[in-house]
Every structure is written in C-alpha cells, then in structure tokens.
C-alpha cells in the first residue's frame, strides 16, 4: 500500500505483433479503493505532506487538516491522487505481468510469509526481504530493455510510424545489437535506488513546526504501540510502484540527448517547485498578513473578558454543571459505554470477528511472493510473467528478419516492373507528339474553310434582311399618314361635341343654382320661424338667471354684515358680563358695609339699580343677537333657494337647446328620406301623442302685446304693496333693499349667454350657423358633380308638406314663453314667510318645463292627466321613459 493510494484494478496491456506492424491493446480503467477502511498513519500522512509541499499555516486558524471524518480521509486522499495524473503517475502501482513474476522466481529468492507480528525487529527483516524481492522483480522487468515501448505505447504511437520500404531498410541497417548485460545492470541499479527512495525517504525540515522530533517520535511510538509500527512497516514496504511505463521512461532517459528534458525531468522540476513553495511558506511572516489593529483589538477583547469574568462565578457555575451532569449520568446509566454490559459483549464479539477475518486474509497470502505495493503472487505466476517478457523479444527479432527478406524480394520485383513500365511510357509519349503535330495541321485547314463559308452565308442573310425591312418601313409610313388624317377628323368632331356639351351643362348648372338659392332661402325662413320661440325663451331665462345672481350677491353681502354685527354684540355681551361680575363683588362688599355700618342705605339702593340696568342692557343685546341670527338663517335659506332656482334655469336652458337640436334633426331626417310627414311613432315616443292630437290639444293662442303685459305686472305690484306685511316680512324687505349690491360679488357657476349689441337678425343667423357648415356655393357645386339628378330629387322634396312640423314646434314652445313672462314677479318685494313658500310653489308650477328627450339621454314625458293642485309635486306626475335613436 502506497502512502497516497492503492489501485485494485490494473491496466493490462496484451501485445501481439502480427505482420510486423499491427498491435492490439486491452485496457482496464483503474478504480481507487481502500482495502481495510482504516486511516493512514501519522507518519505516512506527514511524509505525504512533505512530498507534495502541503503546509498548514497557523494564520488560517479555522482550517483543519484533512477531512472532518477521519474514516473517510484515506478514500478522499486516494481519490484526489487518482484524479491528479501529473503527481500520481510516478507513484502509482500498475499491473506487473507474468514475465516479472517468473523472473523473480528464477532469481532464487524464497517467499516470505507475513505473520501478524508487529515487533520492531520483525519490521526490519520484512523490509529487507521486500527490498530483495522487488530488486529481483526489477531485474526481470528490465530483461526486455530493447522493447521499451509496450503494447500500449505502440498503440499510442501507431499513427506516427511509417512502413515504407526505404524506412524499413534504413531501420534494419542502422539497428545495433542488444547488450542484455548492460541493460540488466542499469535496470537493477535504477530499481534499487528507486526502492530505497520510496522505502526510506529523506526527511527535510521545510517547516520546523511540522518536523518530527525525537520526543514526538517517542510519543508516537508509545501511543501507537506495536500496531503503529506494523502500520508504518506495511506502508513503507507497500509503497513500491513499478510499471512498464516507468521502466520504459527510465531506459529511454539514457538514450535522450543531454539537453533534452524527458518525463522524469519534468517530475523533478515539479519536486523543485514544491520545494520552492515550501521554502516561501517557511519564510512567510504570519504577522505581516494580519491586520494592523489585530493586536490592539485582541488585547482589548482579553481585557474585556477579564473584567466581565470572575473566578468565583466560574467556580460556582462549574460546580453547578458538574452536579447536573452527574445527575444526568445517574439517570441514564444504561446509555453509558462501560456500564452497558450488552453493548460491551457485542463490541467484544465484533472485535473477535474482525481479528478472525484478518487472520483469514493473511492465511490466503501464505506461500505467495510479496512483489510490493500490496501485491502477492505465486511462483507459477512469477514464472509466467518472466516468460511473457522474454518471448516477445525473441519473436520480434525473427519477425523483423523475415520481414526484411520479404522486403528485399519485393524491391527487386518492383524495380523490374518499374523499368518495363518506363520504356512503354516513353514510346507512348513519342507517338503522342507525332499525332499532335498532324492533328494541328488538319484542324487549321478545316477551321479556315468553315470560317469562309460562314462569312458568305452571313453576308447573304444580311442583304435579304435589309431588303425586307425597307419594304416594311414603306408600308408603315403609309399607315402613319392615314392615322394622322383620322386623328385630325376625330379632334374636330370631339371639339364640336364638347362645346355643345359645355354650353348645355352651363345652362343646367345656372338653373340648378337658382333653384338651390330659392330652396335655401325658404329653408332659412322656415328655420327662423321654428327657432324664434325657443330663442325668446332662452333670452328670458338668461335674464332671470342674471337677476338671481344679483340677488344672491346681495344676500351674501348682507350675511357678511350681519356676521360682523353679531361679533360686535358678542363682544359687548362679554363686557357687560365683566361689569356684572364686578358689580357682584361690589355688592358683596357693600352688603358687608351695610351690615357693619347701616348708614349708606341710599348709596346701596343706587348700586342695586345700576345692576338692574346692566342686566336689562344685556337682555336687550341678546334679543338683538337672536333677531339678527334668525335674519341670517332666513337669508341663507333664500340664498340656497335662489341658487337652486339658478341651477334649474340652467337645466331648462340646456333642455331647450337639446329640444331644438332634436326637432331640427328629425326634420332633416324626414327631408333626407323624402317623407311627406314626420315619423308619428317617434313623435308619440317624444311627446306622448301623435302630431294631430298634439295640434288639437295645443291650439295656437295670440300673444299679448308688451304694453298689456307691463300693465298687468304693475297692477299686481300695486296690489301686493297695499297688503299689510308682517313684521318679519317688513324686516326681510328692508334688509333686502338695503343690501342690494351694485355689482355681483361672485361669478356664477355657469356663465350665462352675454348680451351682445348685435341685431336680432344677426343673432338668429348665429343660431343657424351650426346647421350650415362650409361655403354654400362649394357645397352645391360638389352635389352637382356627384349627382346628375339633384333637380328632380329637390322637386320631390319641395312637394313634401311640412305645416304640421311648424305648428307643432310653435305650440310646443308657447307654454315656455308664457312661463318666462312671469319671471319678473320674483324680484318684487318679498312677502311673509308662508306666502313666500306658496308663491315659490306656484312659480315652480308655472315655470315647469315639459319633459322632453335629449338626443343622447332618456327623459320623462308627462302624462295626459293633469294635476289638480297648484303646488309642484313630483309624486303626482306620472311619466315614462322613451329612447329614440
């Protein structure tokens, strides 16, 4: 067993030389294993570290030596050594064939039977015997020195060999006679030196801390005992690795040039490199690699630990732990190693079984020769190894001689054949040159004749083509003249037709333009009639909205003034309360004086009267404060009502605009379809009745003149003034009149339509602008180009009767105009609170709008049933939702 690894399986190379150059190889991959599953000895591990330059620096404190589990250390080392081919190759034990075993047997050495005796003297005898046996094996291995390359080497270099006749002849002529005596002496000398180096390696102290002193050796011997000595002896005796590759490299080294570096030199350089690395580690100062403040921090830590610990506390803790451990041991006595009798019996039985197995394994090796490295062979196997090494050498000599004779015969045969083929080739070349000369003359004459014939044929063909093309050109010219004449006639005819067509088109276009102008003017007048009621309602609603905004601003101003007055009254009340407290104190003092003196009765009565006056003033201020707070609440309610009315007006304005757009879209749709009437189903879905029913229900009424309206409003105002308002109403009216601002304090949420100085005609025109987009003339010209029958379709559209649409829209807009006329009533002097509520309900009832459908949302349509009460109640109005697309 070597210091690093053992190899169970071997690589066996079986070479058989056939026809002088062929070789076969049978190779087994080695497997690393550990025989007895025991760790290496300390000495073996120390020698391995010295050999490979392993040094465990004290700087790396946390890094241990080897692996954590000592049982797996040997297998780990063997696997690492087997994977690292550059370092293991020189020490690996390979297969020793039968020739080596046979040669070792013929030397005359006696086999040594190893016994389980581990005494020191026995160890020396076994080592000497092992050296003799391995020397004999080395002699047997070196017999065939001329055949240095084994079957595996020949297979590797097979691609580099050439087997030409010249190389075989030169190899045969330059080969020297083999001197077996020199080969055997050199092999024996090398083998002995190598065995000595492996069995007794030189100890060099690369690192003093890792060298084994005499005391350490004594400790090791005392601790290890006989078993340790036997293990060391076995490791030293089994550390011999001889193989064919190593022996081949040893013999080849003698034939290399002096300056050429072989595999052994490379291994020596690796050893030097390891030595240099170990020396560098030795010279390394561990303190230089530590941080600068390492010593200071360590001293600080020790000082901290010294202050934090106490010998008394440690002793008490130690005693407590000992007591607890003792109690635990007493409780678990069955688990202790020496107290468990069954465990001890099983351990003794297993130890006896292991010892018996070891004796059986040693008895199997009895009568065998220890070749080294843990290999034991019988004498017959050694004889077979020697025979296998010598026989191939003699067979190779005879095979080379026979191959040389066959090569000489083949050379003579090939030379004769070559000379005969050369003479035939020369005759063939002379005949070829003569034939080439004759062929060139014949070909030149033939090419000249063919060239002249081709030239004559081409000239004749060219003349015929010229004549034919002249005739074609003359005919084409005649056709061109005729085509030009036809083109002129066609142009004159087309110009005449185009002129007539242009004149006709201009006349039709002029007529169509006149008709379109008339139609557009009629449509504009009709649209103005439709939009007029809605425009009037919109103007009235905007005016009413502005009045509501002004009224709201006035209320806001009055609220601000009242709040300031309330703050002033609160301050006065606080002053009066302070005076009351002062008078109370004075009253107490005066009472004491009255009891003591009894003379200032009149002065005391005056003081009491002053207290009563102050209480009266306080009560008065509180009454004024309550009045103004009530007024403030009333104004806030009025402001909220006005704001809601303003929002209602905005909604009504938007509703009217959407109603206008809906009516216009329905009218345009009916005109586009060419219908005589509007779709009655959609009208019914919108108004809840057909157009005829709607006209019958809403008969046209005459509008009152503006002067009559003004008179009616003045009469109502005078009647309201004659009525006796209540005190609250009078106060509200006075406050409203006093706080009416000249300008609005805040802008409305939605800005109303600004009053513009434009004329009524321009304003109506702006309303119609959204129905006519783009220049009218361009639009009419585009329609003329795209459709030739516009005039006929327009005539059909003009024939459609539309009075029902006009009357419907006018009658529908009438109630809204009447409602907006009553709007000025809300800016008169306010009535009492109860009357204000009833008037507001009446105004809501009068100003309510007919629910209609916006073009893109749902709206409720009022039922035919009317409400009997004047107050506005949403619960009494039944409606349904319709959606028209």
Swiss-Prot record:
It is found in: Cytoplasmic granule; Cell membrane. One of its GO terms (biological process) is eisosome assembly. Residues 13-23 have a biased composition (Polar residues). Keywords: Cell membrane, Membrane. One of its GO terms (cellular component) is plasma membrane. Residues 726-757 have a biased composition (Low complexity). It is a peripheral membrane protein. Residues 1-39, 695-885 are annotated as: Disordered. It comes from the Eukaryota. Residues 701-725, 779-801, 873-885 have a biased composition (Basic and acidic residues). Required for normal formation of eisosomes, large cytoplasmic protein assemblies that localize to specialized domains on plasma membrane and mark the site of endocytosis. Belongs to the EIS1 family. This is Eisosome protein 1. The lineage of its organism: Eukaryota, Fungi, Dikarya, Ascomycota, Saccharomycotina.
